[in-house]
From Swiss-Prot:
Keyword Zinc: yes
SUPFAM superfamilies, alphabetized: Cysteine-rich domain, EF-hand, NAD kinase/diacylglycerol kinase-like
GO molecular function, one term: ATP-dependent diacylglycerol kinase activity
Protein name (database record): Diacylglycerol kinase alpha
Organism this protein belongs to: Mus musculus
List of residues binding Ca(2+) 1: D124, D126, N128, E135
Function according to Swiss-Prot or TrEMBL: Diacylglycerol kinase that converts diacylglycerol/DAG into phosphatidic acid/phosphatidate/PA and regulates the respective levels of these two bioactive lipids. Thereby, acts as a central switch between the signaling pathways activated by these second messengers with different cellular targets and opposite effects in numerous biological processes. Also plays an important role in the biosynthesis of complex lipids. Can also phosphorylate 1-alkyl-2-acylglycerol in vitro as efficiently as diacylglycerol provided it contains an arachidonoyl group.
Domain DAGKc span(s) in chain numbering: 368-501
EC numbers on record: 2.7.1.107, 2.7.1.93
InterPro entries: ATP-NAD_kinase_N, C1-like_sf, C1_DGKalpha_rpt2, DAG_kinase_typeI_N, DGK, DGK_typeI_N_sf, Diacylglycerol_kin_accessory, Diacylglycerol_kinase_cat_dom
Activity regulation note: Stimulated by calcium and phosphatidylserine.
Cystines in this chain: none
Enzyme class: transferase
Keywords in alphabetical order: Acetylation, ATP-binding, Calcium, Cytoplasm, Kinase, Lipid metabolism, Metal-binding, Nucleotide-binding, Repeat, Transferase, Zinc, Zinc-finger
Length: 730
């Protein structure tokens, strides 16, 4: 296929992917036109010549003219296929449409069920609704071709594939029906992988270039000439291979292999040395300086990040232990295509979990006594921070451990679903963390993985409480990974929120979420947040820095303090805690907050500090009476310590925007501590602003019930003496 050396360059392949991304056509739609539509005249059975292929590409890419060199290279790539030779016999200048379909589908998304059904019909040449032995053999030939394309070791693959195909024939009829095909492909046999239609199996070998302006003198890995200080070149995210812009087209393929493609590569990881990139300036073998200013010199290992002299290479053994970050890394030797195992090993595990029940493209067997890290990154969080963090983690870890959340958390969780003792790192804001936690909840893991947070953007209340800081500001990610190793597991209570609207015809905004991880509030703070939210949606360019956001928030808070839109809130809200009415008659409130963690609004501690006696927080709270469902006694509330794991909520009254500002700046210690409870019900009589975990909305009169849902394991960062928990500019 297009991977054949000398036929299509990596640059042409990248351009082809862009063409496909911009096109609205699907390869299956175009194939139907050639199969029984107006383009059928170009077909010779399952084969097609160059003129027909050219028309196919124009229609598929929606282009009047496809670059001739690209179209020609693609055609001859397919033409050299072993499968094409088998199918077309003596037809010298034709290619197989089934090859074209499979490999272009590799670059597309789509529902697995649709792909399976269409592929069945593609190989059911006599259209009788079953796959007979001849058609099954053609499928096996195609699978062998895909395996060769992906550089797998195919020496023992054919008998494994034949056994898989026999097992699909569940009724023993000697043929495979559509139902058997779809059932096997959706549950046990990785058919989409074997037929080249699973995008998770995109092959290695392509550099992932990004432009970089170098702040130090470096040398091009191809021509070995310098790239001057302050000049721009290209750096590969995966291997740190550096080139001039004009040298990129001639660069050797990327040597990083993210998974084992042969049985002999499984279990033992070897060093992968790349010339240059020795930024520490000192050899890890002999401890002498590596003089990098005169030429391209030194070697660095992609996996353990050792830096050595060229002359020290012989003194370093071939086996790589992945270095200081071995606890987090899934080395390529731990990941291999599931089809490469034979016999009973290749039979996949069954599970009751339908959300993640798909046949695994890979088997993962991590190094013993390690805790592989699954990294989720929200590229929309924190401006351009997300993209920078993605690039860094793709180099520090195996790129297959790092997932952009544009496709949601499911692909990453599915990839790791059978990995023992893995951890998760979520790079994003509180909303991103909540999204990942909700997806984990639906995945029904037998053992739920603990979650750490790398906070991006503003707010980040949960990250503050878990000691991961107020927001990422370019710190060394290796230091953060070492902190994860030193972290401890704590359990975060999660609460279910049910909104029951009154039947009075008034409309409300959609409720952002039914799950509370951090806090819920009604009144003044939600009003400020709602105005902030509307303005940011209308003018996003005015909210592109942490400082600007704080100034806007200050402006809205000042306006709210003047107009007091939620004055006398107690007259329009009643509060029941565990069935007992909470008396608010002696208070004049503009807001009520229900806290699961002691940080809100980007660093405010509305509950306030409590002088802690020596001892465990849970034991202290029980001694003070928190074992009871309700605590409303003011004297006991003064000594209650917030605990995100105690299955209790703290209820706080807020007098107004001025009091909120005083608490934020530490001029006032806390709001009014009203209660500590395990269930709470609000009844409102007018439309009021509300918010869940910083997401505001306007809610018409309703009843709101909050009950405990479950607990999720989180990772608490190690203590830091310099950590400022509730500083004003945090």
């Amino acid at each position: 296929m297009a991977k054949e050396k000398g036929l299509i360059s990596p640059e042409d392949f990248a351009q082809l992917q862009k063409y496909i991304e911009y096109s609205t056509k699907r390869v299956s739609d175009v194939l139907k036109v050639f199969d029984d539509g107006e383009m059928n005249r170009f077909c010779q059975g399952d084969a097609i010549g160059y003129l027909g292929f050219e028309q196919f590409m124009k229609m598929y890419l929606e282009m009047e003219e496809v670059p001739h060199h690209l179209c020609w290279a693609l055609f001859w790539s397919f033409h050299t296929s072993q499968v094409a030779a088998e199918k077309t016999k003596s037809k010298a200048n034709v290619i197989c449409l089934s090859d074209v379909y499979c490999y272009f589908t590799l670059l597309e998304g789509g529902r697995p069920e649709d792909k399976l059904e269409f592929t069945f019909k593609l190989y059911d040449m006599d259209r009788n609704g079953i796959l007979d032995s001849t058609e099954v053999e053609k499928i096996i030939l195609q699978m062998m071709r895909v395996a060769e394309y992906l550089d797998w070791d195919v020496s023992e693959l054919r008998p494994i594939l034949q056994e898989m195909m026999r097992e699909m024939d569940q009724d023993g009829s000697g043929s495979v029906s559509l139902d058997e095909w779809v059932r096997a492909g959706a549950t046990t046999v990785p058919l989409l992988v074997l037929l080249g239609m699973d995008v998770t199996m995109k092959d290695d070998g392509n550099h992932i270039w990004r432009p970089k302006r170098f702040t130090r003198l470096v040398y091009c890995n191809l021509c070995e000439q310098s790239i001057s200080l302050g000049k721009q070149g290209l750096s590969c995210n995966f291997c740190k291979y550096i080139v001039h812009d004009h040298c990129a087209m001639k660069a050797q393929p990327c040597e990083v292999s993210t998974y084992a493609k042969s049985r002999k590569d499984i279990g033992v990881q070897s060093h992968l040395w790349v010339r240059g990139g020795c930024h520490s300036g000192r050899c890890d073998r002999c401890q002498k300086k590596i003089r990098t200013y005169h030429s391209l010199t030194g070697l660095h290992c992609v996996w353990c990040h050792l830096e050595i002299h060229d002359d020290c290479l012989q003194a370093v053994g071939p086996e790589c232990d992945c270095g200081l970050l071995r606890d987090h890394i899934l080395p390529p030797c731990s990941i291999y295509p599931s089809v490469l195992v034979s016999g009973q090993e290749c039979k996949h595990k069954t599970t009751d979990d339908t959300s993640l029940c798909t046949p695994e493209a890979f088997r993962i067997e991590p190094v013993s006594n390690t805790h592989p890290l699954l990294v989720f990154i929200n590229l929309k969080s924190g401006g351009k921070q997300g993209q920078s963090v993605l690039w860094k983690f793709q180099y520090i870890l195996n790129p297959r451990q790092v997932f952009d959340l544009k496709d949601g958390p499911e692909p990453g969780l599915r990839f790791f679903k059978d990995v023992p003792q893995f951890r998760i790192l979520v790079c994003g804001g509180d909303g991103t963390v909540g999204w990942v936690l909700e997806t984990i909840d639906k995945a029904n893991f037998a053992t739920v993985p603990p979650v750490a947070v790398l906070p991006l953007g503003t707010g980040n209340d949960l990250a503050r409480c878990l000691r991961w800081g107020r927001g990422y500001e370019g710190e060394n990610l290796r230091k953060i990974l070492k902190d994860i190793e030193l972290s401890k597991v704590v359990y975060l209570d999660r609460w279910f929120l049910e909104v029951i609207p009154q039947q009075n015809g008034e409309k409300s905004d959609p409720v952002p979420s039914q799950i509370i991880n951090n806090y819920f509030s009604i009144g003044v703070d939600a009003s400020i947040a709602h105005r902030f939210h509307l303005m940011r949606e209308k003018y996003p360019e005015k909210f592109n820095s942490r400082m600007k956001n704080k100034l806007w928030y200050f402006e809205f808070a000042t306006s709210e303090s003047i107009f007091s839109t939620c004055k006398k809130l107690e007259e329009s809200v009643t509060v029941e805690i565990c069935g007992k009415l909470l008396d608010l008659s002696d208070l004049s409130l503009e807001g009520i907050a229900v806290l699961n963690i002691p940080s809100t609004h980007g660093g405010s501690n509305l509950w306030g500090d409590t002088k802690r006696p020596h001892g465990d927080t849970c034991e202290i709270n029980q001694a003070l009476g928190s074992a009871a469902k309700i605590i409303t006694d003011p004297d006991i509330l003064k000594t209650c310590v917030p605990d995100m794991s105690d299955k209790r909520l703290e209820v706080v009254g807020i007098e107004g925007a001025i009091e909120m500002g005083q608490i934020y700046t530490r001029l006032k210690s806390a709001g009014h501590r009203l209660a500590k409870c395990s269930e709470i019900t609000f009844q409102t009589t007018k439309t009021l602003p509300m918010q869940i975990d910083g997401e505001p909305w306007m809610q018409a009169p309703c009843t709101i019930k909050i009950t405990h849902k479950n607990q999720m394991p989180m990772l608490m960062g190690p203590p830091s003496n310099s950590y400022n928990f509730f500083g004003f500019w945090s």
